[in-house]
């Protein structure tokens, strides 16, 4: 007979702790349990921000708030949600070469694959006991940060990330939705930010418009993923970022303290650890073919699986960090100022003009996207 055959015989406290211990032993740094009830607070926030246009076409959990805030959408018989946090805290290594683009920490390695495997260990135990279990990680089906908050793992920082007491926000989160009757957290963690506003003050585009509220229209992490023309107002602020932006976490006191305690030493030579993926060659992005780029960066979110958006980002970076006297920079911009794709050509035009390489600009042009870029050049700073 399995435990699920007679739920009334289960010692909920003992069984819950066994599952949490299994999660910790499987590599999770933090694990807790929340109710499978509708996440009303998150649903209201998603709907309000969507109606205000703060999502800027972003889909993910915004696509269907009624689904992403209801664990029973994933499992109709759900009673509990186990949520786990896996740390990816690692200090940023020095830039290896001058034409290198920065990558956010959470994609230095496939942390979500590690997270899923840990969550699957919990799910397997539940299933062997006769219960149902659905693993959700990096999934639009659930607002995992809100579940983690309800489970008592941490509080919402002013940068909207979940902050775990004594550890900060460098964590990926995932859930196991189950029909097992478990002991849920009795109350959330109290706010630990106090009067601190470092994340608000240090956001390069002032995208944190109020404590816990992000305007995706300004957020570099989203603008780097969003297809189309990269907003001119934020190109200079992009700096050398190719994918993601960690600025609001890099200044967060609990995150910084935890990183210093747990990370490998930043000035050790990068060998085969995750830090080897912290920087990407701009030259590689602009010269590699589609197949090679998707093979190397296919785990990233790339709109329509089109590496063009990586190249677009790389061209903006080239305009920000390139040297007009560098032969390679000139050759790359010359190549893309004559590229067949208008989106890429327009961003190369911006980069060339920013570096004062006006002789590379197209003499004749009939595409409206590029023409709009050329008309905007006097405002480029």
What name fits each language-model region?
Residues 274-308, 312-329:
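Alpha-helical adaptor scaffolds
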Residues 225, 303-306, 335-343, 363-373, ...:
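Short coil turns that connect the paired helices of HEAT/ARM alpha-solenoid repeats
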Residues 28, 198-221, 238-267, 332:
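Iron-sulfur cluster-binding cysteine motifs and their immediate structural context
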Residues 292-296, 324-337, 356-365:
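Amphipathic alpha-helical scaffolding segments comprising HEAT/armadillo-like alpha-solenoid repeats
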Residues 222-237, 253-296:
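A beta-strand-loop signature enriched in Asp, Gly, Thr, and Trp
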Residues 311-324, 345-357, 373-381:
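Structural detector for internal amphipathic alpha-helices that build alpha-solenoid repeat scaffolds
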Residues 1-192, 364-376:
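Auxiliary alpha/beta "docking" domains used to position bulky ligands
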């Amino acid at each position: 007979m399995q435990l699920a055959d007679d739920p009334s015989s289960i010692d909920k406290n003992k069984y819950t702790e066994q599952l949490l211990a299994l999660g910790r032993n499987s590599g999770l740094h933090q694990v807790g349990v929340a109710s499978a009830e509708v996440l009303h607070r998150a649903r209201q926030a998603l709907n309000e921000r969507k109606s205000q246009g703060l999502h800027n076409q972003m889909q993910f959990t915004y696509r269907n708030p009624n689904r992403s805030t209801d664990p029973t959408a994933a499992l109709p018989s759900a009673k509990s949600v186990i949520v786990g946090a896996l740390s990816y805290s690692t200090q940023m290594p020095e830039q290896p070469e001058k034409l290198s683009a920065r990558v956010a920490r959470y994609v230095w390695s496939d942390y979500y694959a590690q997270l899923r495997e840990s969550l699957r260990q919990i799910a397997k135990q539940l299933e062997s006991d006769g219960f149902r279990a659905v693993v959700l990680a990096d999934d639009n089906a659930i607002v995992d940060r809100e579940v983690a908050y309800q489970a008592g793992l941490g509080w919402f920082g002013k940068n909207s990330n979940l902050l775990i007491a004594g550890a900060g926000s460098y964590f990926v989160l995932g859930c196991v939705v189950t029909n097992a009757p478990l002991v849920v957290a009795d109350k959330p963690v109290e706010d630990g930010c106090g009067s601190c506003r470092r994340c608000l003050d240090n956001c390069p585009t002032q995208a944190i418009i109020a404590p816990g509220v992000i305007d995706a229209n300004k957020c570099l992490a989203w603008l780097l993923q969003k297809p189309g023309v990269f907003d001119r107002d934020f190109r200079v602020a992009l700096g050398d970022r190719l994918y993601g932006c960690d600025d609001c976490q890099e200044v967060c006191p609990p995150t910084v303290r935890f990183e210093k305690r747990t990370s490998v030493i930043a000035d050790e030579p990068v060998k085969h650890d995750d830090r080897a993926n912290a920087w990407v060659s701009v030259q590689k992005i602009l010269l590699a073919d589609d197949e090679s780029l998707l093979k190397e960066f296919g785990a990233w979110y790339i709109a329509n699986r089109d590496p063009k958006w990586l190249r677009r980002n790389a061209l903006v970076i080239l305009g920000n960090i390139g040297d007009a006297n560098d032969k390679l920079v000139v050759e790359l911009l010359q190549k893309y100022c004559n590229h067949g794709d208008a989106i890429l050509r327009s961003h190369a035009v911006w980069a060339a003009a920013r570096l004062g390489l006006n002789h590379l600009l197209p003499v004749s042009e009939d595409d409206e996207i590029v023409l709009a870029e050329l008309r905007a050049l006097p405002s480029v700073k």
